[in-house]
Amino acid sequence: MIKLNVKKFENQLLQRLRDLKISNKKVLLAVSTGVDSMVLLSGMLKLSKVLNVEINVAYIDHQLREQSKEETKFIKEFCFARNIPLYVYRWEKEEHPVQSIEAAAREVRYNFFEKVLKENNIEYLVTAHHGDDQAETFLMKLIRGGNIQQLQAIQSVRIFRENYQIVRPMLIFNKKEIYDYAKQLGIKYYEDETNKSDDYQRNRLRHHIIPVLKAENPEFLKHVLGYTQQLTNNLQVIQEVADVKLNKISKEETLDYDKFVKESPLWQRILLERYLEVKGLEIKETQVQQILAMLND
């Protein structure tokens, strides 16, 4: 078994953080005490002087697991020992919805992150999403169906709630590399018990589907990452062209009907979808078809 080169891992993380403009900045790390976020936190602490970054940590006690109390105590002690500003939110069980708990938990997390960013004048939220997350998310979207735009890769940087940026420097690493780094440096972390449950689609893919695909080709995850990035690049080019076209056929806040219907059916669809996206409107595929049919009737 090939041993992970710790120095190489840290140099790659350092270069990625520099590429993402995380130097001389005040940042907020989203930490769950899982292996991914603890490796990110530990790695950035080692690189903090070189990068000249001021690290802050946000942690949410979701009250979803037996060990959440122990995890909360651990992260408090970890940050206190290293003089790291820590912001904790406790999501009380009484506030948990009966259904769609994952979606609700995500909303709670990001509302809390925004609050901390705003109150502490921090622009960058750093998360520990990694390469395996990228592939799993792609497969989940593929199964769910919908607009091809939704199949784009998880972005290394994206705007968050208009005023902030989410930065994901760990996308260049796979899960095995992260585990290996934690093991070699003796980094303490907690395993989420729910990761073992097949009640969640991501876990079913991780436990049963992806291993079969990896058996067919060990480079499967790498190939998925390549395809999603190619798709993202191509869609971004189309979006840029669409924005130019939209400017030409827009009339104040609306589209110029006469100019719009002169476009090919393919471009009509692209322009309509882009127009609705810019306006912040989400509609179903059947509704897009109905609108296009009415416009061309």
Model-derived regions: residue spans:
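Non-catalytic, well-ordered alpha-helical scaffold segments
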Residues: 38, 136-137, 203-207, 221-225, ...
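AMP-forming adenylation/ATP pyrophosphatase catalytic core
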Residues: 9-36, 56, 91, 108, ...
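Hydrophobic residues in alpha-helical segments
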Residues: 142-143, 214, 295
